């Protein structure tokens, strides 16, 4: 069969790569064409566009990028027509994917959605498009099943592939000393920084994270470098230790060996919890006051992180938008480090 898969960010690339492995296990002759990233390409996808060329976030950024978005939509539709796949598979990224789903469905292609759109959080009206244009919907979050069923739409829970991905990378049981030696790092405890996978996220989060360094001198701060983001981009926010701070392609080991992490709210927060490292989740979108005001109107859930949503209570502290301040971040980080008053509670509830 011929498969056309569309993912628009780093987490989608990870899920897409695992999906391709599963497809090939059941269909060894599968042909896969995709929008995604390095991981999908490494697993045999013929890549049309890398997500680093298509990712847009924040209301202001979307407005500025309307021309690019229209161009990519046109390219994607034409590429599907030229490739003529047996099925089009969408991975999250609903702003783009639901527009393509409309085109695909109207032109007779089967449409599957893997990693269901998080319409329980915002833009619930998208259920209309999902019902109209998506043939089969798959979820990796158990609580989504009841949500979609409440709208009389069938959804299949398929488990969370992050567990397999984490186990595969951590099963070698590497010790802290080995990790430090492999990365030429000093023998100091670690605070891990995961500022996101997009430039806008990194720009909004990393400078504040790095301001903490002088206040925790006994620690080394390590930054998880996102695929597709150049070292030059990170270095503009870093000090003279820049050559030692970036960790490439080894996020899970970094998180495992860290005493605590500061994490951009998203897939990384769930991964950090599954690994078992205490964390503070942070986020700040672009667009200033307007973006925050609009966000408050459209977001319908009490928490932003999947960790808290799955448990339906606050397990990890979320510092979002106006709450993402230096004073609060310093306080919450101190509270989850060894001997901190919140550390034991987080570890007990993971």
What residue spans do the PLM features occupy?
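Nucleotide-activated sugar donor-binding and catalytic core shared by glycosyltransferases
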Residues: 1-350
């Amino acid at each position: 069969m011929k498969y056309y898969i569309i993912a628009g960010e780093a987490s989608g690339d990870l899920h897409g790569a695992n999906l391709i492995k599963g497809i090939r296990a059941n269909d060894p002759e599968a042909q896969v064409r995709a929008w995604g990233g390095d991981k999908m390409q490494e697993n045999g996808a013929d890549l049309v566009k890398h997500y680093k060329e298509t990712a847009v976030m924040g209301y202001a950024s979307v407005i500025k990028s309307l021309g690019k978005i229209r161009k990519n939509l046109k390219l994607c539709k034409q590429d599907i027509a030229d490739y003529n796949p047996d099925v089009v598979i969408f991975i999250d990224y609903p702003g783009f994917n639901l527009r393509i789903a409309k085109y695909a469905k109207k032109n007779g292609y089967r449409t599957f959605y893997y990693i269901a759109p998080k319409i329980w959080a915002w833009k619930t009206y998208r259920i209309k498009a999902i019902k109209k244009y998506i043939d089969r919907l798959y979820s990796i979050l158990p609580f989504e099943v009841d949500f979609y069923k409440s709208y009389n739409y069938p959804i299949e829970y398929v488990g969370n592939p992050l567990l397999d991905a984490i186990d595969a990378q951590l099963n070698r049981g590497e010790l802290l000393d080995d990790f430090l030696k492999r990365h030429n790092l000093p023998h100091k405890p670690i605070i891990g920084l995961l500022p996101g996978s997009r430039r806008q996220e990194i720009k909004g989060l990393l400078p504040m994270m790095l301001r903490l360094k002088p206040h925790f001198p006994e620690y080394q701060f390590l930054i998880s470098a996102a695929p597709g983001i150049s070292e030059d981009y990170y270095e503009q926010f870093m000090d003279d230790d820049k050559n030692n701070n970036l960790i490439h392609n080894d996020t899970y080991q970094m998180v495992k060996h860290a005493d605590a992490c500061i994490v951009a709210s998203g897939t990384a927060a769930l991964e950090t919890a599954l690994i078992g490292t205490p964390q503070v989740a942070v986020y700040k979108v672009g667009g200033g006051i307007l973006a925050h005001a609009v966000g408050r109107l459209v977001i319908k859930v009490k928490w932003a992180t999947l960790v808290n949503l799955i448990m339906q209570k606050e397990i990890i502290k979320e510092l979002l938008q106006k709450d993402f301040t230096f004073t609060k971040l310093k306080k919450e980080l101190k509270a989850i480090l060894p001997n901190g008053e919140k550390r034991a509670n987080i570890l007990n509830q993971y």
